[in-house]
């Protein structure tokens, strides 16, 4: 999977992909492994969109701390892999969120964070798939971009979308699907697809708000990879 992602230390690029696995087949463990490899490869910002519920987000945050970060983001005590080999503090990934706190609005005023990323310690963020939370995250990234007088955040970013089929890819129709009430004439027959099958014409659709929010996050980085995980594509 990592080989298909954007090169975090290469030229500006954007890649998108999907991983499909059966229910309870280890998808979370798979993307935690991908995150670890991505950090080794040089990714500087790692965002996990962990479902719609806070309980799911909390569970994902805990597993991330135990499997990758090595410390509890609240009290900085060693957990999981951190009990076997504790990194020096400057190499511990920085958690913007913790098991008790999603990405909140007050974080948007702190524009110092991303400018202090070291050569070896990425920033990790675990958020709910919630419009308000995603807006807060987008506003924070905008503040960092403007504070550094940049059109785009000059860092490599990996976005993991858990349960990617839920809301992330939703579209809304710009036009009503009006089926003809009378038999079509020869000229009208040519337009049948547009009238009856608007799903085949992407220009007739707009992204829903969550879909658009995820797109906004991806556009803010010069190097980004989106990987959606799902059991029901």
Could you tell me what each predicted segment is?
Residues 1-233:
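RecA-like P-loop NTPase motor core of helicase/translocase proteins
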């Amino acid at each position: 999977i990592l080989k298909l992602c954007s090169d975090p230390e290469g030229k500006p690029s954007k890649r998108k992909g999907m991983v499909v696995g059966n229910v309870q087949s280890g998808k979370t463990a798979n993307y935690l492994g991908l995150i670890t490899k991505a950090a080794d490869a040089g990714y500087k910002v790692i965002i996990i969109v962990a479902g719609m519920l806070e309980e799911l987000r909390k569970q994902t945050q805990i597993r991330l701390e135990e499997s990758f970060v090595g410390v509890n983001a609240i009290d900085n005590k060693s957990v999981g892999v951190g009990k076997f080999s504790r990194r020096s503090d400057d190499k511990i990934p920085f958690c913007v969120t913790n098991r008790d706190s999603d990405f909140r609005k007050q974080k948007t005023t702190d524009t110092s964070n991303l400018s202090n990323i070291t050569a070896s310690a990425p920033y990790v963020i675990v958020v709910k798939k919630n419009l308000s939370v995603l807006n807060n995250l987008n506003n924070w990234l905008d503040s960092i971009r403007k504070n550094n007088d940049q059109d785009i955040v000059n860092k490599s970013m990996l976005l993991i979308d858990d349960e990617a089929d839920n809301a992330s890819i939703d579209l809304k129709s710009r036009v009503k699907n009006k089926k003809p009430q009378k038999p079509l004439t020869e000229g009208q027959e040519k337009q049948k697809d547009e009238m009856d099958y608007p799903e085949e014409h992407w220009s007739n659709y707009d992204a829903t708000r969550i879909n658009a929010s995820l797109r906004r996050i991806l556009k803010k980085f010069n190097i980004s990879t989106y990987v959606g995980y799902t059991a029901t594509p």
